[in-house]
């Protein structure tokens, strides 16, 4: 069916399971907000208006950390998109899956120093896993789907999609994403295989596990480091059981905060520049360091 770029964007967000968007409107993104109004009206997507675009990006980051799902934020061109930079950098450093959607001036105005034209894809290249400038409405759906697959897969992180205003108004055929990758070929098939419905976390090699067990058994002063992976995997109980089983002290990273009970006598506190002396000395003294 024929849809505007704005509607294609919203349909793709719905099919990716997005239920909350954080953002702040502006001139170039108005077509998207006009379409968002319909989706918020029927309860499919909730929009949270922030006081500043940086707040929207940080909120999307917080949403991703607390739910384990991809956070989404909207921003307009110029100062709107540049205000996202700190939030994007934070998500990149902390491996938080977010998709930032910005709108730019029309394609005919790109590269002409137009009002509020900013090369946001160039600015964010070092702090995103991938970013896109969508020049044709025909490629919009595939770009959105690929962005979510990239944000989720491997080491999670931020992805940015910049859409010129005219692309949000132009029309193209929209093909809903199939529920299964069966019978789907080409780029869409590859995207389906990388989607959240079909993505499987990597499984450990049992030979490596056996080797680790041998190393632990031979160690006299092992040290466990509780990192962000414990929190993201919600493996708090399993990690604590491991620490208790091998009777190893536990140092905690900033991202691992909350992954190990502070009242457990095995904890040495936070590690690093702002960490405890006990944790940092334990790193120097251990004969086996296990970072999780």
Task: Give the residues covered by each predicted segment.
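N-terminal alpha/beta PP-like core and its mobile active-site loop of ThDP/TPP-dependent enzymes
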Residues: 1-292
């Amino acid at each position: 069916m024929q849809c505007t770029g704005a509607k294609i964007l919203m349909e793709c967000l719905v099919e990716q399971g997005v239920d909350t968007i954080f953002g702040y409107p502006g001139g170039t993104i108005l077509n998207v907000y006009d379409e968002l109004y319909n989706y918020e009206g029927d309860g499919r997507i909730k929009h949270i208006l922030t006081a500043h675009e940086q707040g929207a990006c940080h909120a999307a980051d917080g949403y991703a950390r607390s739910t384990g799902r991809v956070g989404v934020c909207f921003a307009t061109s110029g100062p709107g998109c540049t205000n996202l930079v700190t939030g994007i950098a934070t998500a990149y450093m902390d491996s938080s899956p977010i998709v930032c959607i910005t709108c730019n001036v029309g394609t005919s105005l790109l590269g002409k120093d137009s009002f509020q034209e900013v090369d946001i894809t160039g600015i964010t290249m070092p702090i995103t896993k991938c970013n896109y400038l969508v020049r044709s409405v025909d490629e919009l759906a595939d770009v959105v789907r690929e962005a979510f697959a990239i944000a989720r897969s491997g080491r999670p992180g931020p992805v940015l999609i910049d859409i010129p205003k005219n692309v949000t108004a132009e029309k193209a055929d929209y093909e809903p994403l199939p529920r299964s990758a069966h019978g789907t070929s080409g780029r869409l098939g590859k995207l389906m295989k990388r989607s959240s419905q079909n993505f499987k976390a990597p499984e450990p090699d049992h030979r490596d596990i056996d080797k680790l067990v041998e190393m632990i058994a031979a160690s006299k002063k092992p040290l466990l480091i509780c990192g962000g992976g414990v929190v993201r995997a919600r493996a708090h109980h399993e990690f604590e059981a491991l620490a208790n089983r091998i009777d190893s002290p536990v140092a905690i990273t900033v991202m691992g905060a909350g992954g190990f009970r502070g009242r457990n006598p095995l904890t040495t506190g936070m590690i690093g520049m702002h960490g405890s002396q006990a944790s940092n000395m334990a790193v120097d003294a251990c004969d086996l360091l296990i970072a999780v």
